[in-house]
């Protein structure tokens, strides 16, 4: 199967973008995302984003996100800026775009060359909106959470997808590959959760690292950055109504909390490359002589091995 793609990144949060507006999303999209996202062995990315025909009147397109493990996400802040940039450079040259997501319709405004502002919608701290269980019914702001026998103070935010935000003294000192999975798969979050670890520089400047469900540590996460600023506002650390600049491993995003808990994100979107991939369907592996070996039940396979002279002297068989 021949597949045309565009690789794009926002703050180094990179995805493979497929134009699915006419043909629709490939049936094997989950397996395809796993295969093509493998770094060093394939194109390499945080997942695949499909640009689809809109489902809402007045929308310009719909975005569907598939993580590197094949699971489907609901919203991606960095990804939606790249979708807007892709549409703008592929004939939809509007200064304001409307894009469908599984978290609702989002409005994106062009603010310069490759620079986009996204109205992300309102956030919620209620456990039912995450969802979160065994944490009561009150807003999840500065609550204790035991993770691998360690007690953390967390603020949980839904910004179209679920996030768990915690303040740490030094984000660079964290061993995210160890603690990230423990947060992601915590029993209190039945649909898993994204986790942001944030270091406060001052009231309008933060440093952040993120562990994304389904992808592991990524160099940036737009929704995670929004959740982080929302959490810091809830804690009284960052001011509402002002731009807060968040430094991630892949770059900087600017977030503002507006009245009604609405969030606005501004950041860049860039095309890395375009290309065509030849994706092979899985088949039985052929031998050099050109025929395939059919799979055998275990018992038959052992019986055939026993007939080979060089195997009969080996202690392989038991009773």
Locations of regions flagged by a protein language model:
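A glycine-rich beta-to-alpha transition motif near the start of alpha/beta enzyme domains, typified by
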Residues: 1-114, 164-279
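Membrane helix-loop-helix hairpins that form the core translocation module of multi-pass transporters
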Residues: 113-117, 121-123
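Glycine-biased, low-complexity coil/linker segments
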Residues: 299-300, 317-318
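Active-site glycine-rich loop that binds ribose-phosphate moieties when present
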Residues: 124-153
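Short, acidic, Ser/Thr-enriched surface-loop or helix-capping motifs
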Residues: 67-68, 157, 296
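Short hydrophobic alpha-helical segments enriched in small aliphatic residues
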Residues: 290-292
């Amino acid at each position: 199967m021949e597949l045309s793609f565009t690789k794009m990144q926002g703050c180094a949060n990179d995805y493979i973008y497929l134009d699915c507006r006419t043909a629709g999303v490939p049936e094997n999209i989950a397996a395809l995302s796993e295969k093509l996202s493998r770094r060093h062995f394939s194109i390499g990315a945080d997942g695949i984003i499909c640009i689809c025909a809109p489902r809402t009147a007045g929308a310009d397109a719909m975005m569907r996100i598939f993580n590197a493990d094949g699971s489907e996400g609901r919203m991606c802040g960095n990804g939606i800026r790249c979708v807007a940039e892709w549409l703008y450079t592929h004939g939809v040259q509007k200064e304001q775009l409307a894009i469908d997501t599984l978290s609702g319709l989002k409005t994106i405004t062009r603010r310069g060359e490759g620079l986009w502002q996204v109205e992300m919608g309102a956030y919620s701290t209620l456990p039912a909106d995450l969802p979160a269980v065994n944490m009561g019914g009150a807003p999840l702001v500065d609550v204790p959470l035991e993770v691998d026998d360690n007690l953390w103070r967390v603020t949980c935010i839904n910004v179209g997808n679920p996030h768990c935000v915690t303040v740490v003294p030094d984000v660079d000192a964290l061993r995210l590959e160890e603690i990230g999975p423990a947060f992601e798969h915590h029993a209190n979050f039945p649909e898993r959760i994204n986790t942001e670890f944030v270091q406060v520089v001052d009231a309008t400047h933060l440093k952040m690292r993120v562990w994304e469900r389904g992808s592991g540590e990524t160099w940036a996460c737009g929704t995670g950055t929004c959740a982080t600023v929302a959490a810091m506002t809830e804690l009284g650390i960052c001011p509402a109504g002002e731009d807060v600049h968040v430094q991630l491993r892949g770059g900087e995003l600017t977030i503002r909390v507006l009245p009604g808990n609405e969030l606005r994100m501004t950041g860049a979107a860039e095309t890395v490359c375009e290309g065509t991939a030849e994706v092979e369907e899985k088949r039985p592996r052929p031998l050099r002589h050109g025929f395939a070996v059919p799979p055998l039940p275990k018992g038959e396979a052992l019986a055939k091995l026993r007939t080979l002279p060089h195997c009969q002297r080996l202690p392989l068989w038991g009773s």
